[in-house]
């Protein structure tokens, strides 16, 4: 899909949730990417200001043309959305009217082979959104077998995680695994493609490594709490997710913050008592794409939108249960052989 335009998913639904056009305000686009949401937000309301954040310096550089054209209505900042409250305050804004988060990897990252996110075109095994720190190649070539199995099982939900980890170790003993194509071939040797699914055997393993390299679930956890701290009463938080690990964290956050106890489960070892409601639910469950959008934009098919409206209750302490969801739980180690 290289060269295809980026289409923001569930755009009409996000615009409706954020109630654009109801007067001047400030909205945070915590995941700028190719600028799809920011561009749509600016076009929908001439009185709106947008503070857009992206940890990827390439995305920030590419967005400067849009920022210049917005005439001061768009402020584009390089940073992590987990720090969005601090970033917003550094911009001289104490509270905002809306926050939108589109979680996960962007199409502009997937489409560039040199970024090393995708198995669809061979490139260096990198996956770093910021271009610094531990790369996927570092992890694949340096992590112990058990750690690789844990990462692939929990963050990729790959049932064959032990077999994949074992195959990676056998391959790296012969030579370092340096490219996305090499890793995809190793995984395809032990994971069978599901007939008729159209899903590449390496999909779950690549997802797991990307999440681990960029601490994506930890960032999501921090971003939800940061949004809670920076939204004014009546402000709204809209979060679009693309797989069950992300959606589970968002669902538990809104459940707990809307007055429901976070119940114990195999993912949440301890229940947490309800706290004063900091959010009311805007969406009573996940909102998915229309049939027309799913047909026009394949990326939208797995998208889910959840949203909440901030109350005037003080922001409580961060939920320990969400931090547990974002980490590797010891009892989920290994997966099946």
UniProtKB/Swiss-Prot annotation:
Ranges for region Disordered: 286-316
Subcellular location per the Swiss-Prot or TrEMBL entry: Cytoplasm
Catalytic activity line of the entry: cytidine(1402) in 16S rRNA + S-adenosyl-L-methionine = N(4)-methylcytidine(1402) in 16S rRNA + S-adenosyl-L-homocysteine + H(+)
Residues bound to S-adenosyl-L-methionine: 35-37, 54, 81, 102, 109
Top EC class for this record: transferase
EC number(s) reported in the record: 2.1.1.199
A molecular-function term among this protein's GO annotations: rRNA (cytosine-N4-)-methyltransferase activity
One annotated GO biological process: rRNA base methylation
Function according to Swiss-Prot or TrEMBL: Specifically methylates the N4 position of cytidine in position 1402 (C1402) of 16S rRNA.
The name this protein goes by in its record: Ribosomal RNA small subunit methyltransferase H
Name of the encoding gene: rsmH
